[in-house]
Amino acid sequence: MSITPAKKSELISEYKVKDGDTGSAYVQCAILSERIRNLTEHLKVHKKDFHCRRGLMVLVCKRRKGLQYVRNKYGNDAYLDLVKRLGIRDVFH
């Protein structure tokens, strides 16, 4: 359900804004998206894992707030580019 350090460093290198960047909103949204994908796959098998389902909802809300921050801080074009790169739906339009 959690992501491996190798996958996390791969996501960081793919979504970083500059060298040494590990905590920008882009990277955080990418890591949250990967965790959401993993939990979604888990819930397809374990349908009655309600504790996990609540954790998934918390992660989705965190990602939504991060995406909202990107949209407000960097503009709509940067937000739409990030949504497209992550392969998720646009939640604000």
Swiss-Prot record:
List the InterPro entries hit by this protein, alphabetically: Ribosomal_uS15 (IPR000589), Ribosomal_uS15_bac-type (IPR005290), uS15_NS1_RNA-bd_sf (IPR009068)
Q: Which organism is it from?
A: Anaplasma marginale (strain Florida)
| Assembly behavior | Part of the 30S ribosomal subunit. Forms a bridge to the 50S subunit in the 70S ribosome, contacting the 23S rRNA.
Q: By its UniProt entry, which SUPFAM superfamilies does this protein fall under?
A: S15/NS1 RNA-binding domain
Primary role: One of the primary rRNA binding proteins, it binds directly to 16S rRNA where it helps nucleate assembly of the platform of the 30S subunit by binding and bridging several RNA helices of the 16S rRNA. Forms an intersubunit bridge (bridge B4) with the 23S rRNA of the 50S subunit in the ribosome.
Similarity remark: Belongs to the universal ribosomal protein uS15 family.
This protein's GO cellular component annotations are: cytosolic small ribosomal subunit
Its lineage reads: Bacteria, Pseudomonadati, Pseudomonadota, Alphaproteobacteria, Rickettsiales
Q: What domain of life does the UniProt record list for this protein's source?
A: Bacteria
Name it. Answer: Small ribosomal subunit protein uS15
Q: Name one GO biological process term.
A: translation
Tell me the GO molecular function terms: rRNA binding; structural constituent of ribosome
Q: Which keywords are on file for this protein?
A: Ribonucleoprotein, Ribosomal protein, RNA-binding, rRNA-binding
Stored NCBIfam families: S15_bact (TIGR00952)
